[in-house]
A protein has these predicted regions:
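Structural motif corresponding to the early beta-alpha repeats
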Residues: 77-106, 135
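Surface-exposed, active-site-proximal loop segments in enzymatic domains
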Residues: 57-61, 92-107, 140-149
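Aromatic/hydrophobic pocket-lining residues that form the small-molecule binding cavity
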Residues: 32, 66, 113, 117, ...
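Active-site groove signature of glycoside hydrolases
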Residues: 122-145
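An active-site-proximal structural segment forming one wall of the substrate-binding cleft
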Residues: 109-128
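Beta/alpha (TIM)-barrel catalytic core signal, keyed to glycine-rich beta->alpha loops juxtaposed to Asp/Glu
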Residues: 56, 137-345, 352-354
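Active-site mouth loops of central-metabolism enzymes
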Residues: 20-30, 99-111, 151-157
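N-terminal binding-site loop/beta-alpha segment at the start of enzyme catalytic domains
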Residues: 1-89, 111, 127, 172
Length: 356
């Protein structure tokens, strides 16, 4: 396993981060703990990402289960807490049943951030969070597959300064070490950056956005410039590098997908099942076969090899076999077979087909 500093922070993270959003829904506690043991004890991963709303699809009766599982593992694993870089996320607006919100829709106001972190710390059984991220913006932003900005959806939002004040308070209390953003735009990052400088608050060090072979143009343009070490020095943490599993090729083959996420939860991540996305996946699968890689190795290897852009790629699995394949794809001898020029050619033919 390789390691890198996360953005401008002193956090040293593995270049693969273990995602957790299926734990407590598709995966049992025992299965989740086995995944943690494999990733941390066999492959040397040290980076773990969760969220207050997990597992996904999110619902009141399961919310928080993922954190509880992680908390038990942290206590039982025998791994020192300081050897685990633990990241979590404060939910954006729109969920009415999160702890401490008194039945109101979640927001990213100061009190929401503080209540969220206190509840997360309790579930996780830890005294601090290494990386606290805002899961999605309090203001309107086209995310989760939406493409064009729709001005009619603009709304009043929590000031950037208020959000930063809450985060800074938690940092001063020792409950949060570093802060990051998720599903954010260039405008949002720069507004936060300017406000943080004005208030004398430490900067955001990471950006967790969707990034994959079929969803890359948004980052490759404006966000890449913003996050560059020459500019804001923010580390990219790609989520959905396999586009919900679509890029494994299993949904386009004769494999049994009855137990897979997109089959179990119709409508979930439907953006990845559009006809143009399916066509792009077929092209990437054909390229993978030609160069002697699995579709998974091609899709993940493309992310992994971008060390100048990607800090750590977030992977998720519903079985240990899947997890091992994802981790074994972190292999420079496999990356050597990946021709970025040919990948870029497919991208030009099917540019961001998951966008609506």
């Amino acid at each position: 396993m390789q390691f890198t500093k996360l953005g401008s922070s002193p956090l040293v993270v593995s270049r693969v981060c273990l995602g957790t959003m299926t734990w407590g829904q598709q995966n049992t506690e025992a299965e989740a703990k086995e995944q943690l043991d494999v990733a941390f004890k066999e492959f040397g991963v040290n980076f773990l990402d969760t969220a207050e709303m997990y597992p996904v699809p999110t619902k009141a009766e399961t919310q928080g289960r993922t954190d509880l599982i992680i908390g038990k593992w942290l206590k039982e694993s025998g791994i020192s807490r300081d050897k685990v870089v633990l990241a979590t996320k404060v939910a954006g607006p729109g969920i009415s049943w999160l702890p401490g919100r008194n039945g109101e829709n979640s927001r990213v106001r100061k009190r929401d951030i503080i209540v969220s972190v206190e509840a997360s710390l309790k579930r996780l059984g830890t005294e601090y969070i290494d990386l606290l991220q805002i899961h999605w913006p309090d203001r309107y932003v086209p995310i989760f597959g939406a493409n064009a900005y729709n001005r009619s959806l603009e709304r009043e939002a929590t000031p950037f300064e208020e959000q930063l004040e809450a985060l800074n308070e938690l940092i001063k209390q020792g409950k949060v070490r570093q802060i990051g953003l998720s599903n954010e735009s260039p405008y949002g990052i720069m507004k936060f950056s300017a406000a943080a400088q004005q208030l004398g608050i430490q900067p955001f060090v990471s950006l967790q956005n969707s990034y994959s072979l079929i969803n890359r143009a948004e980052f490759d343009s404006g966000l890449s410039e913003v996050c560059s070490p020459r500019n804001e020095n923010i580390g990219l943490l790609p989520y959905s590098p396999l586009a919900g599993g679509i890029l494994t090729g299993k949904y386009a083959s004769e494999q049994d997908t009855s137990s897979c996420r997109l089959t179990l939860f119709p409508g979930y991540m439907a953006r990845y099942k559009q006809s143009l996305a399916v066509e792009a996946v077929k092209k990437y699968c054909a390229l993978a076969k030609e160069v002697g890689l699995t579709p998974t190795e091609l899709a993940l290897g493309w992310c992994y090899k971008q060390s100048d852009t990607v800090a750590s790629t977030i992977i998720g699995a519903t079985s240990v076999a899947q997890l091992r394949e994802n981790l074994e794809a972190f292999d420079e001898s496999k990356w050597a077979r990946i021709d970025n020029a040919r990948i870029d050619d497919i991208h030009r033919q099917c540019k961001d087909p998951s966008k609506t």
